[in-house]
């Protein structure tokens, strides 16, 4: 059984190398592309103007971002065995601040998102004993958003 798994692993690893060599990386859209492609802001602005509930959500996000600007960046403070609450605060802040920057072009939001990412990157760890904490602490979501 071990031999079969080893052979399968060798075969699969060889195939992925071939696929990677054949992939045309020039066809990938430029950044930003993760959640909101370049120019996507205009479609959101139009939807906000046409759909009042969406305008309410947008306004609430902007209010939260403005409030975040007055608060200190997140700190590594565990609750019992968990860092999950802090992870979720960081994720929410980075996501919302990135959105605010893209929608307004105001660099204060981008700078603050960067501060939040730097703050979590300085944590001694992301609580690897609880994988959900680590998963929630994905700061790449803010990168080039």
Language model segments and positions:
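N-terminal low-complexity, Pro/Thr/Ser-rich intrinsically disordered segments
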Residues: 22-30
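Boundary at the C-terminal end of the N-terminal hydrophobic targeting segment
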Residues: 18-20
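Aromatic-lined, polymer-binding surfaces characteristic
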Residues: 33-49, 53-145
């Amino acid at each position: 059984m071990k031999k079969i798994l080893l052979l399968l692993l060798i075969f699969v690893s060889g195939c992925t190398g071939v696929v990677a060599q054949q992939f045309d990386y020039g066809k990938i859209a430029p950044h930003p592309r993760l959640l909101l492609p370049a120019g996507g802001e205009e479609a959101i602005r139009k939807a906000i103007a046409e759909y009042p509930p969406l305008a309410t959500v947008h306004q609430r996000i902007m209010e939260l971002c403005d409030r975040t600007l007055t608060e200190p960046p997140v700190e590594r403070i565990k609750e019992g065995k968990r860092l999950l609450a802090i992870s979720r605060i960081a994720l929410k802040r980075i996501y919302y601040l990135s959105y605010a920057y893209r929608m307004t072009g105001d660099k204060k939001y981008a700078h603050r998102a960067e501060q939040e990412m730097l703050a979590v990157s300085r944590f001694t760890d992301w609580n690897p004993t609880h994988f959900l904490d680590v998963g929630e602490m994905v700061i790449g979501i803010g990168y080039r958003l």
